[in-house]
Amino acid sequence: MRAERDRHTTAVAALLAAAGLLLGGCSSAASTTASTPGSASSDTVGSTAAQGPAAGGGPSSAAAAASASGTPAGDARPGVTALEPLPAAVPTALAPYYGQKLSWQPCDDGFECTTFKVPLDYAHPEGGDLVLSAVRAPALPADPGSGPGSAGAGRLGSLLLNPGGPGGSAVEYVEAAASSFDSGVRARYDLVGLDPRGVGRSSPVTCLNGERMDAYTAVDITPDDQAEIDALVAADKEFAEGCRRQAGDRLGHLGTVEAARDMDVLRALVGDERLNYVGKSYGTFLGATYAGLFPSRTGRIVLDGAMDPSLDSLGGNRTQAGGFETAWAAFAKDCAKREDCPLGRTEQQAGEQLTALFQAVDARPLPTADSGRRLTEAQATTGVIQAMYADFLWPRLRTALADAKAGDGTGLLKLSDSYYDRGADGSYPNLMFANMAVNCLDLPAPFGGPADVQRAVPDFEQSSPRFGRDMAWMALTCSYWPVRATGSAHTVRAAGAAPIVVVGTTRDPATPYAWAQALAGQLESGRLLTYDGDGHTAYGRRDACVDGAVNRYLLGGDAPENGKRCGA
């Protein structure tokens, strides 16, 4: 939706929703008490979107990197080229960054924190630096009774984690989720979280204060007349201008390619020859980008809840709308079987009653228990979408919908607030601001203005009768972004890389299963692991088949056979 890619510590919530924010300028995050690695286990969970010759040694954007290859890779769409690797040798101009010494200091109740520098612009490293923050959970003593290959085995180095977004804090994610990782993985890896540039503790981008964000999340995203269109455009312009004013030059250097290059600097600084990595949602796009740029430095890579980098922003947003429709159908089918379902006794009735509820809230926003705030249609839609990220939120959604039909919008507003990780004091974290900044830089805007959106709405509604119109208008923000996109759609082959495990969930709302199939097919060494189930992402959600396959790979390098299926 509007800025999402996961914590009852702001970490896991913002991280899991962030793990799946909406493409049009959003990905998603969630508020949870993580009980398993990288999975949603609390109130919120998260969509994403992704993405010249450099003195620093190669392209500083996906577009520049892809331009090196004039031939589409594999079954790429017309005009979509391959992301080409950077030179294997570290350029002289970047040697000082790769030669830094990390100073890990105790922090945050049992963790270790550090900072290091990267160039603002890899094409011109002399032009100034950014300071990035990382945290690690040092490897624990092996438990002889733990999982595959753990007891007595040697250390494997660092395992870099990213929860998604873009905009999810990997620092917060590691601190929230480290204790839930497999004991064998914890015994052989330091778990490391790097907040990407512009995110969390790494030179974070901010755009609006809490009061203005409340207004932004409430604005009508299904405008019925010119006045409502003008109000939506004004809100998008205010958001974009706030980012420009407060971020300055950084706004043009927050792309995924640059973030992947930052990860390579950290890989070298922790002393690893190859990067080992688990990325979720948008984190899969970041990890795939790393593999494409540095295939010879790619170690054991797990991409869970995968994005398809060959999609442009229009195609990505439209297919993502279809993903949420699929998730809604699963919810509606389940709801219709339950006594407390407030939407009727058939899937068709559930859809009709949800549409009627949205229309009623659009005409007359509902009162809530939150200091005079009223629930708007935009927030009602966001609340429903939030619950599609994980089926453990479905009971809460049933209650919220029943309350809304009775005239109380409190439950849906709380779900909407958890999507954005809004604090009880009315403040918002950096998540949504970074989400928009990265998405609008990685891909050209899908629309030039409101007229383009209006023309596209029928196609979006065909993909998603429930959410298509909303998600088309949500994608308008990047049309007013003050910085031109530097990236473009591309395939990622990562020729010569070790096996890369791509995990897809069949009814994933934020990253549709077809995206995982596409990414696994693009990667020369891709191995598709399928989880037949609901919710966003699969690893760490207590499916023994998925968790066992991923843990065996991380611990012993034994990648699952391509096409392996788990779940129902």
Residue ranges and their predicted role:
Residues 84, 351-498, 542:
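Alpha/beta-hydrolase fold active-site neighborhood
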Residues 509-514:
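Conserved alpha/beta-hydrolase "acid-adjacent" motif
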Residues 270-282:
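Alpha/beta-hydrolase fold nucleophile elbow
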Residues 169, 261, 279-291:
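Glycine-rich nucleophile elbow surrounding the catalytic serine of serine-hydrolase chemistry
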Residues 206-218, 289-352, 399-414, 418-424:
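A catalytic-pocket lid/entrance helix-loop region that shapes and gates access to the active site
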Residues 2-10, 14, 27-221, 227, ...:
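Catalytic-loop region of hydrolases
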Residues 532-538:
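Histidine-bearing beta->alpha loop at or near hydrolase active sites
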Residues 22-25:
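C-terminal motif of bacterial Sec signal peptides marking the signal peptidase cleavage site
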